């Protein structure tokens, strides 16, 4: 999966 820098990543 790609890192979506639009959602809060944990």
Curated annotation (Swiss-Prot):
Protein's cellular compartments: Secreted
Protein's organism: Rhyparobia maderae (Madeira cockroach)
Name of this chain's protein: Leucosulfakinin-2
Family, per entry: Belongs to the gastrin/cholecystokinin family.
Sulfotyrosine sites (modified residues): 5
Tree of life domain: Eukaryota
Modified residue annotations for Phenylalanine amide: 10
Major location (coarse): secreted
Role summary: Changes the frequency and amplitude of contractions of the cockroach hingut. Stimulates muscle contraction of hindgut.
GO molecular function: hormone activity
GO BP: any one term: neuropeptide signaling pathway
Sites bearing Pyrrolidone carboxylic acid, chain numbering: 1
InterPro entries, A to Z: Gastrin/cholecystokinin_CS, Sulfakinin
Keywords: Amidation, Hormone, Neuropeptide, Pyrrolidone carboxylic acid, Secreted, Sulfation
Keyword Signal: no
Gene Ontology CC: extracellular region
Pfam families in the cross-refs: Sulfakinin
């Amino acid at each position: 999966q790609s890192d979506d820098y639009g959602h809060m990543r944990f």
